Amino acid sequence: FNEAGDMPGKIREYCKKTGQKIPETMGAVVRAIFESLALRYRWTAEKLEELTGKKYSTINIVGGGTKDELLCRFCANGTGRTVVAGPVEATAIGNILAQAVAAGEVSGVEEAREIVRNSFETKTYIPAEDLREGWDKAYARFCELIG
């Protein structure tokens, strides 16, 4: 899916080739994209845990994706981890705070993080336990498909 073009068509073709249900509507295509993102987030979190020997119970999502509640819910449910979404304008905030640190107005990363925590709203998404089994099955299939 790295090359530009008819992405819904490419998704449908991939689903057909791999024996998955083919998304017929644009809504079904979007759902397939969001589900695969959530499952890839889980895969990535598990790989990070293997590499670092640490457990990560929370995923922070920043930027424009935080405005999509369905994506955030899928991320929480698909990963089995709490998701903290926000702030939306993370790039601009980070830029300003990096300049403030460089100018000596902010002491460092910890103070900058505290400023963000105290200045911007976030929304927390908790994984729905009643959906766990379905997401686990989807994840097992996802892992088979990606090798």
Question: What are the language-model segments listed below?
Answer:
Residues G78, V101-G104:
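Short, hinge-like loop/turn segments at secondary-structure boundaries
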Residues A92-A102:
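Short, small-residue alpha-helix embedded
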Residues E46, G104-E105:
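A generic secondary-structure boundary signal that marks alpha-helix termini
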Residues K67-E69, A98, G108:
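Short, electropositive, low-hydrophobicity segments enriched in small/polar residues
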Residues D6-M7, V101-A102, F142:
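Alpha-helix boundary/capping detector
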